[in-house]
Amino acid sequence: MLNKVCLIVFLFFSIPSFAGDQATMGKTKLTFTIVAPKSLSQEGKQLFLSHAEWMKSTHHHTGPQALLSYDVSEMNELTNPTDLKSKPTGNVIFILSEIYESDAGVEDHFARTPDWKDWPKFDKWLNKCKVTKVSAAKIFNSLTWAGK
């Protein structure tokens, strides 16, 4: 019995040390996946550059509304997403990822959205694309080694 208890205690304390930094566990993640026609990709990129500047100047850096991470990535949509050598479809995929301390950060973000000068253009652009929006997902698993 004591051996089992020791094993459980050892696993409880040692496994996280091999799993990378888990600083985002339990935080709130907003993710938009946008599939845009190639003809709209440059417009999208410009809008995301404006969005990043607005985010930097308006969002909290500490407290329950803190924006902890922000990134936008893009790639050509592929006919076979797991084969990087497959033919492109002619669309571009953008992935917007924002991590907040809590749901309060997402609520604050959406309350501020109308103040972004390019919001009407962004909304119009989104309506021309195929969009999947995940507004406030809880992070339950996280491995982060970036910069280490």
Residue map of PLM features:
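Boundary at the C-terminal end of the N-terminal hydrophobic targeting segment
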Residues: 19-21
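Structural beta->alpha junctions
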Residues: 35-40, 100-101
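Short amphipathic alpha-helices within nucleic acid-binding modules
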Residues: 42, 102-112
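A common structural junction motif
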Residues: 52-56, 114-120
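Alpha-helical transmembrane segments and their immediate juxtamembrane flanks
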Residues: 132-148
